[in-house]
Curated annotation (Swiss-Prot):
<keyword id="KW-0808">Transferase</keyword>
<protein>
    <recommendedName>
        <fullName>DNA-directed RNA polymerase subunit Rpo10</fullName>
        <ecNumber>2.7.7.6</ecNumber>
    </recommendedName>
</protein>
<dbReference type="GO" id="GO:0008270">
    <property type="term" value="F:zinc ion binding"/>
</dbReference>
<feature type="binding site">
    <location>
        <position position="53"/>
    </location>
    <ligand>
        <name>Zn(2+)</name>
    </ligand>
</feature>
<comment type="subunit">
    <text>Part of the RNA polymerase complex.</text>
</comment>
<feature type="binding site">
    <location>
        <position position="52"/>
    </location>
    <ligand>
        <name>Zn(2+)</name>
    </ligand>
</feature>
<feature type="binding site">
    <location>
        <position position="9"/>
    </location>
    <ligand>
        <name>Zn(2+)</name>
    </ligand>
</feature>
<dbReference type="Pfam" id="PF01194">
    <property type="entry name" value="RNA_pol_N"/>
</dbReference>
<comment type="function">
    <text>DNA-dependent RNA polymerase (RNAP) catalyzes the transcription of DNA into RNA using the four ribonucleoside triphosphates as substrates.</text>
</comment>
<dbReference type="GO" id="GO:0003899">
    <property type="term" value="F:DNA-directed RNA polymerase activity"/>
</dbReference>
<keyword id="KW-0240">DNA-directed RNA polymerase</keyword>
<comment type="similarity">
    <text>Belongs to the archaeal Rpo10/eukaryotic RPB10 RNA polymerase subunit family.</text>
</comment>
<dbReference type="InterPro" id="IPR023580">
    <property type="entry name" value="RNA_pol_su_RPB10"/>
</dbReference>
<dbReference type="GO" id="GO:0006351">
    <property type="term" value="P:DNA-templated transcription"/>
</dbReference>
<keyword id="KW-0862">Zinc</keyword>
<dbReference type="GO" id="GO:0005737">
    <property type="term" value="C:cytoplasm"/>
</dbReference>
<keyword id="KW-0963">Cytoplasm</keyword>
Length: 71
């Protein structure tokens, strides 16, 4: 579960999460052998300019899927 707002500045970031995730997956599928995935332009296109908000999206890990079997 992505946080609704950036922990540092309070900007709403959850509204771009699904689009960000979809674009990253699409870009991964189109990578050539040896290429490195660069997501900076995806974040720029989505309007995520502050480095604190970019950090929130780049470092997020979906733990719900990992922890779900232990309910």
């Amino acid at each position: 579960m992505i946080p609704v707002r950036c922990f540092t500045c309070g900007k709403v970031i959850s509204e771009v999460w699904e689009e960000y995730k979809a674009r990253v997956e699409e870009r991964k599928m189109n990578l050539q052998h040896g290429e490195v995935l660069k997501v900076g332009d995806i974040l720029d296109d989505l309007g995520v300019e502050r480095y604190c908000c970019r950090r929130m999206l780049l470092s997020h890990v979906e733990l719900v899927d990992v922890l779900a079997p232990y309910q």
